[in-house]
Every structure is written in structure tokens, then in C-alpha cells.
Curated annotation (Swiss-Prot):
<dbReference type="Pfam" id="PF22019">
    <property type="entry name" value="GlgB_N"/>
</dbReference>
<keyword id="KW-0320">Glycogen biosynthesis</keyword>
<keyword id="KW-0321">Glycogen metabolism</keyword>
<comment type="function">
    <text>Catalyzes the formation of the alpha-1,6-glucosidic linkages in glycogen by scission of a 1,4-alpha-linked oligosaccharide from growing alpha-1,4-glucan chains and the subsequent attachment of the oligosaccharide to the alpha-1,6 position.</text>
</comment>
<dbReference type="GO" id="GO:0005829">
    <property type="term" value="C:cytosol"/>
</dbReference>
<dbReference type="InterPro" id="IPR044143">
    <property type="entry name" value="GlgB_N_E_set_prok"/>
</dbReference>
<keyword id="KW-0808">Transferase</keyword>
<dbReference type="InterPro" id="IPR006407">
    <property type="entry name" value="GlgB"/>
</dbReference>
<comment type="similarity">
    <text>Belongs to the glycosyl hydrolase 13 family. GlgB subfamily.</text>
</comment>
<dbReference type="Pfam" id="PF02806">
    <property type="entry name" value="Alpha-amylase_C"/>
</dbReference>
<feature type="active site" description="Proton donor">
    <location>
        <position position="484"/>
    </location>
</feature>
<dbReference type="InterPro" id="IPR054169">
    <property type="entry name" value="GlgB_N"/>
</dbReference>
<dbReference type="Pfam" id="PF00128">
    <property type="entry name" value="Alpha-amylase"/>
</dbReference>
<keyword id="KW-0119">Carbohydrate metabolism</keyword>
<comment type="pathway">
    <text>Glycan biosynthesis; glycogen biosynthesis.</text>
</comment>
<dbReference type="InterPro" id="IPR017853">
    <property type="entry name" value="Glycoside_hydrolase_SF"/>
</dbReference>
<dbReference type="GO" id="GO:0004553">
    <property type="term" value="F:hydrolase activity, hydrolyzing O-glycosyl compounds"/>
</dbReference>
């Protein structure tokens, strides 16, 4: 190439750089070998002068080809340690040359694994990484944007001007740039120039921290600086069967559990106040609690209640409070509403120290259309399908991931591993699984596309869920993976090698709807709907079910649990206690939403907080005591959880007394052979001398009674227990003559050490 051609080429490169249209800046910038030695070129928009500093010498750089392309001649390869002195706008500073660091960040194997969808730690390459290259500290930026014409890093480092830091395109649509000297806390985005000339500013899909809403820039954050203290917990978890334990989950939304006053900011460890994050518009002057404050207040509360796990509604970064977190824009970052990533790590660490597991809601089914997010990311439908018939949830106003694309699946599967590895979470609840499994979900005829076989099943999503669960349990065998799946899709909790989806728990939506339909009935009509409370047993062993009374049942005009109940206030309290008691004694793991544990009356509202003042009233305090005691009973009696998924664990005594709306059954444990007798009366009418058959003669201690005075009940019961009579009923030769309190549930335990002739105890219940 002649001199004139080279000069013309450099002029064109300068124009491409100036117009943010250059995809290979390393071809012209940084150290470049030539016949005369080495040329060092720097791209410095709007700089007045630039000098090369090397080996104690300052060499003035010239602009022979473009006013912003500065260059100097040196005799030897300058490497990457040289610095430049830049004068811009009357300010002089020194820096290293970003385009001197030419080595690839993502290696060939990284690119290969990512392209086939199997790079389970891709976040260690993608995103913004505080690192050191050739002894120089800075931040390595790495982005996947295969359809982009050019990509630049913008942010605090360059006054958000995309002309300053163009990135280098690598194989496979990967863009890279190392910015020396950049530190933790810097704000940044990517400026993406599309093939048709449009320019978008996007947050980092792999960003590890983002600004507090309404701002939405990504933040350079350190990944591995937190000192964990939960090694014993983690070792025990991953060496245990996740389901062979009592699981009682407190589902909650961090931002609406309780608020604090903005006049009382949280004082950070360095002694400075944290700027308050307003708690929206329902309570002027209210602010959100920080992760640290939640650790101080929430964890002791949950521990006192006896729950084994906290499930937090989505804490991944999201722009709109009203989405409850289910419209995610920052998949690799806990929301900054409540603090920093390390503060969330400290929250999890504290939970583990107190014996409480942490489950997060994970939303791989869809994402919002926010301009800074994944939608139309690089000028093309990169993360979503291009056809709205399979790529858009019109009712939700969101987009659907293209699960057929390897890199998109990799983004999600690695994200799952990221949360377990980086934040030590113990489980996930996957939201809206049914919306992923069916192509016609919430779609009228003509607005969806069938699969390759002509069916409605989304086979791509099925394969994705199977891959995600398979990889999860490979890495974390003690994890919980819970599906919110509202249809009868088969084998949700069966292993993937058997054709199942690979979850180990599924929310029992049928049980939830049947229970709420039943308990909303006037008790007189319940005799005609006995099937509602018995039907679940006929299918409960088809999956590993978790019983859930979730946030979805206390919003959008459905009212809270207390207000669903019929009758006067006393009956509402009693019905609530009876429902919760039946839930805790029914096969399946447990989840209730915050507020249910004390009888919240108002619907949940994300803009407010819970009605904590209700605990000043004894009936609500009684419901809280009931939940406390149910959790104590549940954890103390393996018959209530050990064989949740084995038919041996449950046996009806009588489910046919429709007229009285009474049911009785046994919960059994195979390992010890112990069992419990459960009797429930779902009408306000008490019953004396009610006979219940039992398998062995002897004394049966009444170990729980939801009608006890301390719970707000009428204090009817069986004097602490009853001996059996030789009166055959329900297929047994022996039976108990019981008093059944109104709207109640009781649990009895056979006491082999107690004689039938023992004197009766003095207590009433």
C-alpha cells in the first residue's frame, strides 16, 4: 500500500472513529509496527495536545491525518506500560493507553462454550471486571452484540460521549476494551451503533450493580471481595437431601414489609448516612429499609416465627416498583434500592448464621421493553424472538426470551449458577412456568405459532428448563428449585433423564384454589363441597408439591386471607386458624406470604407496608402465636414432613362426613413408625362425643388445638388428651371419644408410655 493510500486509510479511520462507526480500533490505535519502527496512535477527541511519556522522555504527538488521532514515532515496541499526557479544555492529566492492551479477554474455549450455550460461568468474562493486565489495574469491559456496527463504553470516564472509548470487535460478536485506571463505583453504559445508523444506550446485561431507580446506569462493582462465614451451612446443605427436611417458607417483598422514616437515615459502617430511597407515594416521608436493616429486623422476626426459609420476591434489578420485581432489567445484580451487592451477601450470610435458608424468585420467562434493557439490544432481536406471536406477551407488555438461541440460554443458565455461587442462595422459585411451556398462553387463536410438530407446547422452553435444572443440581445438589406451574403439565418434578422438567418442588396451585374456594363458603354450604378439601390427596403424590398461599392471592381485589373468610370477626379468625392448621398438617412443604402469619386485613400493596399495628389486638397476636406453634410442631414431628412425597406418609381415617364437614387422617413416618392423628371440624358447630377410629389402643395426647385460648379460640378441647375405647369405627377396633371445637383442627399423638388408667390432666386443651 502506497503512502497516499495509507494516509487516506488513516483519514477514513479517523472519520469512522469520530462518527462512532469503527469496529476494529486496534487496527489503527495503540502501538503499530511499521517499516520505520513503531507508531503509537492515540484517539483523543477534543484534546488540544497529547504527549507520549516513555522511559523518562516526553514526546509530543502530532495529528497528521485527523485532528483527534495523535501519533508519535518510536524505535522499539513500547509495550503497554507507557503513559500519555493529555490537555483537554485547559485540564492536563496523565493516563495509560486503552488501545495498548491488545490481548483477548475471552479465549477461544470461552467463545466456543458460550456459542454452544454451555459456559456456566460466563459472567466471569462478560460484564465489567476490575482486573489487572500486565501489572496495570483497570476495568475490562466485555459485551455480546453480534449485530452492532460499533460499540463504545460511555460513562463517568468520558462524560457519556461515545466517541472516546470505542471497543474492539472479536470473533463471535464479542466486544472488548480494557480501560486502565478505572475504579469501583464508576457509572457506565454501552453505546451501541446499529447497522442502520441508530444509536442506543444500554445498561450492561451482565452488570453486577446498577443505579437506584429511576436512574439506570450500570456500576462497576467488585465480585469477590466479601468474606463469607457460612461454610458449615453450605457444606451441610450440599451434602443433604433438600427435600428430607421440614421446609416452611416466609414469602415476602423486601420493599413493603416495613418502612422507616426518611428523617432517620441508615448510618453506614463508615459513619456517614446513606441517602434514603423513598418508599413511593403512599406514606410521605417513608423510606425503604436497607439490606443491613432488614438483616437486623427481618431475620430475628422470621426466626422467632419458626420459618426455615425466607423467599424474597425478585431482587434482581428492576426499574418499576409496581412490577414487584418481575420485570427485570439487571439479571446479574441485586437491586440497589436496598443497598450494595455485598450488603445483600451480608444479609444472606446472617440468615445462614441464624439457620434460615434464602430462596429468591427467578424470572426467566420474559423481560420488559425498557429502552436501557435487553429489548432490541444491538439493533436486532437478539434476546427475544423477532416474531411477536412467539416473542411477546401482549397482555403483560413484555418480551419472551428466544430459548432456541444458545447464547440466550447461556445468559440465563449461567445467571442461575451466578446467584447460587456469588450470593450463596439456597433455592429459586421460577415464576410463571406455565407461560413458558405453552405457546398459546394468554393468546387468542391466530396470535400464536405452533411448534415444529403442530402443537402448542414450547419445546424450546422445555429444553431450556431441563438444561437449567440439570446444570443447577450438577453444581449445587442441595439446592431447591421450585416451579410455579399452574397447569397439569406432567413430570414437573421428575428428573430430566426421565423426561421431566427437573424441578424438585412444584407449587400446588390446585390445592390453593380449592382451599380458598372452600373456606370462602358459608360453613353451612361446606357439606356440599367436601371434595374441595379432600381432592388434593388423590393427586398429591404425582409431583413433589409445596403448598403455597402466595402474594398472588392477596392482590388485585382478591382481598387478604382474613377478609376471604365468612362470618363475624370471631369466625374469620377461627377460619384463618383452621386453614393454616390444615395447611401445616397436609402433605407438602409450606409457603405463606408475609402478613398471613398475623392476620393482615388489607390487601397487599407494594407501595405501602404491613399492618403491624394489628398486633396490638389479641386475636391477631393469637394468629401469630398459632403460626409460631405450628412451625414448632412441624419441625418437631417428622411424621409431618419426612414422607411428604411417599404415600405411606398419609392415610385417611374418615373423609366422608360431609354432613358435619369433619375430616380425620393420619400423618405417618416410615423410619420410626410413628404417626399423628389429625381431626378437623370446619363448621362453627362444636361436637361432643365424636368418634374417631385409631390403629392402636392407649392414650392419645392432644399436642395441638387451633381453638386454644392463647390463639384466640373458645378453649374447647379434650383435657390434654384421651384414652381409647374398644369401640370399633372407621375400620379400627379402637377409637377416641372426642370433643371437636368449632372451626378447629387438633393433632393427637399416641403415647405408648402412658396407661389407659392414668389420671386426666388438669389443662383444658
Amino acid at each position: 500500500m502506497g503512502v497516499a493510500a495509507v494516509l487516506d486509510w488513516l483519514v477514513q479511520d479517523g472519520e469512522r472513529l469520530a462518527s462512532c462507526r469503527h469496529d476494529h480500533p486496534f487496527a489503527v490505535l495503540g502501538p503499530q509496527a511499521s517499516d520505520q519502527g513503531w507508531t503509537v496512535r492515540m484517539w483523543m477527541p477534543e484534546a488540544q495536545s497529547v504527549s507520549l511519556l516513555q522511559a523518562g522522555e516526553e514526546i509530543a504527538m502530532t495529528t497528521p491525518n485527523h485532528p483527534w488521532v495523535f501519533e508519535a514515532q518510536v524505535s522499539q515496541d513500547p509495550g503497554c506500560h507507557y503513559r500519555v499526557k493529555v490537555e483537554r479544555g485547559g485540564i492536563v492529566h496523565e493516563q495509560h493507553d486503552p488501545w495498548a492492551f491488545r490481548g483477548e479477554w475471552m479465549g477461544e474455549m470461552d467463545r466456543h462454550l458460550f456459542a454452544e450455550g454451555n459456559h456456566h460461568h460466563i459472567w466471569q468474562k462478560m460484564g465489567a471486571h476490575l482486573t489487572e493486565r500486565d501489572g496495570i489495574t483497570g476495568v475490562m469491559f466485555c459485551l455480546w452484540a453480534p449485530n452492532a456496527l460499533s460499540v463504545s463504553v460511555i460513562g463517568d470516564l468520558n462524560s457519556w460521549d461515545g466517541r472516546h472509548h470505542p471497543m474492539q470487535q472479536r470473533v463471535g460478536g464479542i466486544w472488548e476494551l480494557f480501560v486502565p485506571g478505572l475504579e469501583e463505583g464508576h457509572l457506565y453504559k454501552y453505546e451501541i451503533r446499529t447497522q442502520d445508523g441508530h444509536c442506543y444506550q444500554k445498561a450492561d446485561p451482565y452488570g453486577f450493580q446498577h443505579e437506584v431507580r429511576p436512574d439506570n446506569s450500570s456500576v462497576v462493582a467488585r465480585l469477590n471481595g466479601f468474606q463469607w462465614s457460612d461454610q458449615t451451612w453450605m457444606q451441610k446443605r450440599d451434602s443433604s437431601n433438600a427435600l428430607d427436611q421440614p421446609i416452611s417458607v416466609y414469602e415476602m417483598h423486601l420493599g413493603s414489609w416495613i418502612h422507616a422514616s426518611a428523617d432517620e437515615p441508615w448510618i453506614q459502617p463508615d459513619g456517614t448516612p446513606r441517602p434514603p430511597v423513598p418508599a413511593a407515594d403512599m406514606k410521605p416521608g417513608a423510606r425503604l429499609l436497607t439490606y443491613a436493616e432488614l438483616a437486623d429486623r427481618l431475620i430475628p422476626y422470621v426466626k422467632d416465627r419458626g420459618f426455615t426459609h425466607i423467599e424474597v420476591m425478585p431482587i434482581t434489578e428492576h426499574p418499576f416498583d409496581g412490577s414487584w420485581g418481575y420485570q427485570v432489567t439487571g439479571w446479574y445484580a441485586p437491586t440497589s434500592r436496598y443497598g450494595t451487592p455485598d450488603e445483600f451477601r451480608a444479609f444472606v450470610d446472617r440468615c445462614h448464621a441464624e439457620g434460615i435458608g434464602v430462596i429468591i424468585d427467578w424470572v426467566p420467562g420474559h423481560f420488559p421493553k425498557d429502552a436501557h434493557g435487553l429489548a432490541f439490544f444491538d439493533g436486532a432481536h437478539l434476546y427475544e424472538h423477532s416474531d411477536p406471536r412467539i416473542g411477546e406477551h401482549k397482555e403483560w407488555g413484555t418480551l419472551i426470551f428466544n430459548y432456541s438461541r444458545n447464547e440466550v440460554r447461556n445468559f440465563l443458565v449461567a445467571n442461575l449458577i451466578f446467584w447460587f455461587e456469588q450470593f450463596h442462595i439456597d433455592g429459586i422459585r421460577v415464576d410463571a412456568v406455565a407461560s413458558m411451556l405453552y405457546r398459546d398462553y394468554l393468546r387468542p387463536d391466530g396470535e400464536w405459532l405452533p411448534n415444529e410438530s403442530g402443537g402448542r407446547e414450547n419445546t424450546e422452553a422445555v429444553r431450556f428448563l431441563q438444561q437449567a435444572n440439570h446444570v443447577l443440581f450438577q453444581h449445587f445438589p442441595g439446592a431447591l428449585s421450585i416451579a410455579e406451574e399452574s397447569t397439569t403439565w406432567p413430570m414437573v418434578t421428575q428428573p430430566t433423564d426421565s423426561g421431566g422438567l427437573g424441578f424438585n418442588l412444584k407449587w400446588n396451585m390446585g390445592w390453593m384454589h380449592d382451599m380458598l374456594d372452600y373456606f370462602e363458603l358459608d360453613p353451612w354450604f361446606r357439606q356440599f363441597h367436601q371434595n374441595n378439601i379432600t381432592f388434593s390427596i388423590w393427586y398429591t403424590y404425582t409431583e413433589n408439591f409445596m403448598l403455597a398461599l402466595s402474594h398472588d392471592e392477596v392482590v388485585h381485589g382478591k382481598s387478604h386471607l382474613m377478609h376471604k373468610m365468612p362470618g363475624d370477626d370471631w369466625q374469620k379468625y377461627a377460619n384463618t386458624r383452621a386453614l393454616l392448621s390444615y395447611m401445616w398438617t397436609h402433605p407438602g412443604k409450606k409457603t405463606i406470604f408475609m402478613g398471613m402469619e398475623f392476620g393482615q386485613r388489607a390487601e397487599w400493596n407494594v407501595w405501602g407496608d404491613l399492618q403491624w399495628d394489628l398486633l396490638n389486638y389479641e386475636p391477631h397476636k393469637g394468629i401469630q402465636r398459632l403460626v409460631d406453634d405450628l412451625n414448632v410442631l412441624y419441625k418437631a414431628e417428622p411424621a409431618l414432613w419426612r414422607d411428604d412425597f411417599d404415600q405411606f406418609g398419609f392415610q385417611w381415617i374418615d373423609c366422608n362426613d360431609n354432613r358435619h364437614s369433619v375430616i380425620s387422617f393420619m400423618r405417618r413416618e416410615s423410619a420410626s413408625g410413628t404417626w399423628l392423628v389429625v381431626v378437623a371440624n370446619f363448621t362453627p358447630q362444636s361436637h361432643s362425643h365424636y368418634r374417631v377410629g385409631v390403629p392402636l389402643s392407649g392414650f392419645y395426647e392432644e399436642i395441638f388445638n387451633s381453638d386454644a385460648a392463647k390463639y384466640g379460640g373458645s378453649n374447647l378441647g379434650n383435657m390434654g388428651g384421651k384414652p381409647t375405647d374398644e369401640w370399633g369405627i372407621h375400620g379400627y377396633e379402637n377409637s377416641l371419644d372426642l370433643c371437636l371445637p368449632p372451626l378447629s383442627l387438633m393433632v393427637f399423638k399416641h403415647d405408648p408410655k402412658r396407661s389407659l388408667n392414668s389420671s386426666e390432666p388438669d389443662n383444658i386443651v
